[in-house]
Amino acid sequence: MGLFLPTTKKELELRGWDYVDVILFSGDAYVDHPSFGVAVIGRTLEAAGYRVAIVPQPDWHGDYRDFTKLGRPRLFFGISPGCMDSMVNKYTAARRLRSEDAYSPDGRHDKRPEYPTIVYTKILKQLYPDVPVILGGIEASLRRLTHYDYWQDRLRPSILVDSGADMITYGMGEKVTLELARRIAEGENISDITDLPQTVFLTKTDAIPGGITDRDIVLHSHQECLRSKRAEAENYRHIEEQSNMMHAQRLIQETLPQPLPLREKGKYPQEGISTKEVSSPLPYRERLGESLYVVVNPPYPPLTTEELDASFDLPYTRLPHPKYKGHRIPAYDMIRHSVNIHRGCFGGCAFCTISAHQGKFVVCRSKESILKEVRQVTQMDDFRGYLSDLGGPSANMYGMKGRNQKACEKCRRPSCIHPLICPNLNTSHQALLDIYRAVDALPGVKKSFIGSGVRYDLLLYRGNDEAANRSAEEYTRELICHHVSGRLKVAPEHTSDRVLMLMRKPPFRQFQQFKRIFDRINREEGLRQQIIPYFISSHPGCREEDMAELAALTKDMDFQLEQVQDFTPTPMTIATETWYTGLDPYTLQPVSSAHTPQEKLAQRQYFFWYKPEERPALERSLRRIGRADLIPRLFGTQPHNSQPSHYSHPSHDNYRADPRPQKPGKEKRGRNRRHP
């Protein structure tokens, strides 16, 4: 394991450096671990011979000394908001400030501004106007084109316009960042680098490289999208398809830099610097009012196993920087003893951003690389023999890909398993079983748990490959018997097949089938494990009647739900575009959604049917929607004699709105704790 990348002038001097090639600014605390993107990019550049420094969570107030303490980099500044979109990280679905920031020391939520991508860029461009600023990370990736911002309740243009940065490197950034650094180091001007895959830049119409050709997809302009929600919906279909193609086309969208309207005081969260300052384009970029075009170059092909191994095999310390000694970083606590074994997800869930950021093609690490990292974990002072997770974006997609790759190269489907599992997909779980067994055989490993989400539709699928079918059965039993820490969490998300179709999730009967298998194996093996389902309310297409049925069905299955959340519209998902536009981007048919707090609360209340204090409001709601027949099914035949009470919003403040995973095996406490 190597030293930490330098974060201060003193640390530069200890290395004998009198300059730095690249300075990375991050909205997260600096944790030198392959699950933290800034550490990955920093180590990747370091391995290529560049001098790299990191400034984690700079103070954006006052004299900006954190932005000047390391001086001017030789090549460029890189900016990442952190592992999550800053607004998802900071606010709940109800636009309330979260109680803690999991990626900050001691969970403090005052260590990063809103939209750090914008705030950091503007400060750096003010201080160093001639130094390129490159945006990376999920916030910039998912805001690379016109997008709906839930927290401001309006369409925003590409974050390049709002920030004044020079370029976005979207998606997983190792390869593109290395190539960009090489070209700038060789003397190319950032404004001349317009052909680099997986980058986004702004240009005038007469400067679009090669001009607009038949190979390009020209999207509706930002101004058209402001006028027409249909235009925005039509755009998104192209964006999603191209994000999931092996050989994508270039996307071009006209945009118009202009000051954006001031928000009403107190109506929405306030950004770290003034709204006027954030929203106005910078004068160095182009004069106000001149039309510019956002150009999104197609991505690189997926990494090879060898390239992915190289990224994970870099000399990470796997620890928070020593500056945080005595402070707890909650997100690190969750992953300190976990190992990521693949990237990408072909699930294509409507509310998920993974395919837009990592793509649908699964890239796997080699067994040797995985075992090497597990051995490192076993040497950690606080390791007691239990790995918290061997997984990835999904627990059981390791080693899966299309049998005929030529067919995959032409495919436009955003999901390989919805609405039906593609017959070309190799669904064998054998490679994953081999990984589990090899890990569990290592000295020092007592047990490896699976904390990532399990796709039970892949476990239930029976195709023409009998070996793959047998491996799914074998995996199911091994998972339940040896890799569950008492509670297996899965995500049916809803019970209505109509809503599930919009979510791109399998029918609810598959969850019921999987639960029967889970219960049977528990009986056969003498286990007393629980299956914990996740559910979402207020997803586009979901009606109050659907939530009433959800309450009745889950009650019949003896669940008292705890892992629940309200749908949060986040940039660049089909669910968000449907929620905002009211249209399905693929069919352009209308889809209704719950928008107001009252409409959302009316749906969310059904999660908590088992709480006596909620019964009066639920009975009134069931009668109002014409489903009084569900009252005896939920509450029995005994009438409720208490006086009607006004339904109180704070009674649901503790529902699970946080999309971040909990530590595997951790018992939920408080009002949503499952009763024995």
Regions found by a protein language model. Name each.
Residues 263-265, 271, 286:
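Glycine-biased, low-complexity coil/linker segments
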Residues 61, 191-214, 222-244, 300-303, ...:
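Terminal amphipathic helices with adjacent charged low-complexity linkers/tails
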Residues 24, 40, 54, 60, ...:
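Conserved SAM/AdoMet-binding glycine-rich loop
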Residues 37, 56-252, 288-290:
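Glycine-rich beta-alpha loop elements in corrinoid/cobalamin-binding modules
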Residues 85-94, 142-144, 174-179, 361, ...:
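Flexible glycine/acidic-rich beta-alpha junction loops that bind and position SAM and/or redox cofactors
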